[in-house]
Amino acid sequence: ADDEDCCSYEDRREIRHIWDDVWSSSFTDRRVAIVRAVFDDLFKHYPTSKALFERVKIDEPESGEFKSHLVRVANGLDLLINLLDDTLVLQSHLGHLADQHIQRKGVTKEYFRGIGEAFARVLPQVLSCFNVDAWNRCFHRLVARIAKDLP
């Protein structure tokens, strides 16, 4: 019930609507640009987080490795948003993501908080009626599950 209070049905519906605007199939290049802007914002506010992405060639933003990572992050978030009303599958997937991130040295709760802040700063720039409160309530709930065992 606590999850319901923090990310209500109305919040989930609003988030899916917002995300549909960002994620429509006609905007494939825009998706990568948005996630790149999110990472740029993250690195601006949390510069030490940049070292976590050396494996995906963060210093070569036009590389296939980095663009592929951006797509994976965006697709992962897309999946989570589309699972917001399927609690059992969502919880299973969040557990999987938590396991993946606990294995990555240097990943912290603070960086997850930072990427949430970055999305909240970037998305209003590309969406005219972005509901930051609904976004934060749902995004923070998802991140809390993924980052629960991180330092």
Swiss-Prot record:
Q: Which Gene3D superfamilies match?
A: Globins (1.10.490.10)
- Highest taxon of the lineage: Eukaryota
Which family does the similarity line name? Belongs to the globin family.
Subunit details for this protein?
The extracellular hemoglobin of the earthworm consists of 12 subunits that have a hexagonal bilayer structure with a molecular weight near 3.8 million. Each one-twelfth subunit is composed primarily of disulfide linked trimers (chains A, B, and C) and monomers (chain D).
Location in the cell reads: Secreted
Residue stretches making up the Globin domain: 6-151
- Molecular-function annotations in GO: heme binding; iron ion binding; oxygen binding; oxygen carrier activity
Keyword field? Disulfide bond, Heme, Iron, Metal-binding, Oxygen transport, Secreted, Transport
**Can you say what this protein is called?**
Extracellular globin-4
The organism that produces this protein has a lineage beginning with:
Eukaryota, Metazoa, Spiralia, Lophotrochozoa, Annelida
Query: Which cysteines are cross-linked by disulfides?
Result: C7-C138
